[in-house]
Design a protein with these regions (language model features):
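Short, polar/flexible loop-turn hinges at active-site or ligand-entry regions and domain interfaces
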Residues: 17, 71-76, 180-181
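Generic structural signal for secondary-structure transition and capping sites
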Residues: 45-46, 94, 205
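Extended alpha-helical scaffolding segments used for macromolecular assembly and cargo binding
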Residues: 73-160, 165-168
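C-terminal boundary/linker of central alpha/beta nucleotide-binding cores
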Residues: 1-70, 80-83
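Heptad-repeat amphipathic alpha-helical coiled-coil interaction surface used
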Residues: 86, 98-99, 111, 153, ...
Length: 245
């Protein structure tokens, strides 16, 4: 914990429901939890510093257990606290923690949105295995109606060497796309789905299907997605050369 996070959790927030069902916390008053934490730290009471700057702390184990027991007496407060923590962590760039708190609050739609947001950076840094651990905590019904999340899952399972599981998610992505409104974020998906299938075919040693899906990906991937188009061209060339032998 840190001062700003404690301010966010201790503030009397109003979680406002809007017509589309989203929930956002209103701005909290300017509490001074940082001063309180500093005083407790100086007195060596209840908390332990986690960094040299003494910005982050944890509770002493026994005190944490006591607070946890007290909080469990009010389940609604537990959910509300997790939701507030999720919003705070997201606003401050801690998306992994934001996801964990959203799941703890059982706000699975919010958790799914966070998983979609963080996937590109986790894929770029070879963390798709960790990302798959995230979405395995989400209900299947939440995943399969989200074409972006399904496509990301298809790619991640392909990276993990599970082409059959990948294909199931790619099929769910196509079904979700068929019933979805036309949105800019959906435009790259058909090409990405085709490219993922090319990788799955390559993993199975299916050269003809690799060429077919890689060529389809070249047709579908937007012109400005230079990286994905280059992947499709490379796969087409490599598979065609293998086929010609």
């Amino acid at each position: 914990m840190c001062g700003p996070l404690c301010d966010a959790l201790l503030a009397i927030w109003k979680i406002e429901g809007v017509e589309d069902g989203s929930r956002e916390p209103s701005n909290p008053p300017d509490l001074q939890a940082s001063d309180l934490l500093s005083n407790l730290d100086s007195a060596n009471l209840f908390i332990v510093p986690l960094d040299n700057d003494r910005q982050w702390y944890r509770y002493h184990r026994l005190f944490a257990d006591l607070l946890r027991q007290r909080l469990q007496q009010s389940p609604a407060d537990v959910t509300d606290s997790h939701l507030r923590a999720s919003h705070w962590h997201q606003a401050n760039g801690y998306l992994a923690e934001a996801f964990q708190h959203a799941v703890a609050a059982k706000d699975f739609e919010r958790a799914a949105e966070l998983a979609e947001q963080v996937w590109p950076s986790m894929e770029d840094t070879f963390q798709t295995t960790a990302w798959l651990g995230w979405i395995k905590r989400l209900p299947t019904d939440v995943i399969r109606v989200r074409p972006v999340l399904c496509t990301q899952a298809g790619w991640s399972f392909s990276d993990a060497g599970e082409p059959e599981t990948s294909e199931r998610h790619l099929q769910n992505a196509e079904r979700a796309l068929a019933g979805a409104a036309d949105r800019a974020e959906f435009k790259p998906l058909p090409g990405n789905i085709a490219l993922a299938r090319a990788y799955n075919a390559q993993a199975r040693g299916q050269v003809a299907d690799t060429v077919k899906y890689a060529e389809l990906a070249q047709q579908l991937i937007p012109e400005d997605d230079v990286y994905r188009r280059a992947q499709a061209v490379s796969m087409t060339t490599s598979a065609a050369a293998t086929k010609a032998r």
